[in-house]
Amino acid sequence: MKQYLELCQRIIDEGTWVENSRTGKRCLTVINADLVYHVDKNEFPLITTRKSFWKAAIAEMLGYIRGYDNAADFRNIGAKTWDANANDNQAWLNNPHRKGADDMGRVYGVQGRGWSKPDGGSIDQLRKIVDNLSKGIDDRGEILSFYNPGEFHMGCLRPCMHTHNFSLLGDTLHLTSFQRSCDVPLGLNFNQVQVFTLLALIAQITGHKAGTAYHKIVNAHIYEDQLELMQSVQLKRSPFPSPQLSINPDIKSLEDLETWVTMDDFEVTGYEHHEGIRYPFSV
């Protein structure tokens, strides 16, 4: 929690105003932010200086794991995060590759589970990672990438958190996640929860102990219409201790994650928080 607040304060103190062409808004921006999550100690990085909703974040990651390409599928498992980008983004609405309502195109999990090859085949990156790690193999390339510039035109949004690199040291699994851009007041808590949970899940289904998750952000920003709430409300509050995340121990394989797992298989305990803050969202 401390590192989140320190990043927010750093953006305010050191940030540069940048005009964002996609949203038409200015962002106060810094380059390079590093966050660390101690999954081994179960210090779940859920923001406590405002009420945060962790279930949608985990549901979204579950949708990525399953390779979903439709906002309706995400809604069905508890995440409404793709509704706007799939249905309210004018550039995507005008895109000939859009298949209809709720279609997201070839984004995120589609790339992770079915990266297109020049010969017409596809690569299931996540399956390869899980298979290797389950055998105790780390080939120094256990990398899950959603970033495919050759197909950006076929999706509603380029990936923000685009790469997850797993590393196995002995019987302990670590994760380094890379993010090109982050809306810190709104998006970062989602991303923190997802990085933490992804390491916890992959460690569990491959039979390893979860270690440390490293989260690297390139462009960290606060939109101009979010700044006042951040300065006058959230940064004035004192954080509470981190809560803990429990995952159903019956989840033992990638197939389990693909088929029967729901949000009922996750539980957060010890979550104390301040009142919610309604930050503006930029599509």
UniProtKB/Swiss-Prot annotation:
(6R)-5,10-methylene-5,6,7,8-tetrahydrofolate binds at residues 183, 282. It catalyses: dUMP + (6R)-5,10-methylene-5,6,7,8-tetrahydrofolate = 7,8-dihydrofolate + dTMP. Keywords: Cytoplasm, Methyltransferase, Nucleotide biosynthesis, Transferase. One of its GO terms (molecular function) is thymidylate synthase activity. The active site is at 160 (nucleophile). InterPro entries: Thymidate_synth/dCMP_Mease, Thymidate_synth/dCMP_Mease_dom, Thymidate_synth/dCMP_Mease_sf, Thymidylate_synthase. Its EC number is 2.1.1.45. One of its GO terms (biological process) is dTMP biosynthetic process. Coiled coil: none annotated. GO terms for cellular component: cytosol. DUMP binds at residues 22, 180-183, 191, 221-223. It is found in: Cytoplasm. Pathway: Pyrimidine metabolism; dTTP biosynthesis. The keyword Repressor does not apply. Belongs to the thymidylate synthase family. Bacterial-type ThyA subfamily. HAMAP family: Thymidy_synth_bact. Catalyzes the reductive methylation of 2'-deoxyuridine-5'-monophosphate (dUMP) to 2'-deoxythymidine-5'-monophosphate (dTMP) while utilizing 5,10-methylenetetrahydrofolate (mTHF) as the methyl donor and reductant in the reaction, yielding dihydrofolate (DHF) as a by-product. This enzymatic reaction provides an intracellular de novo source of dTMP, an essential precursor for DNA biosynthesis. This is Thymidylate synthase. The gene is thyA.
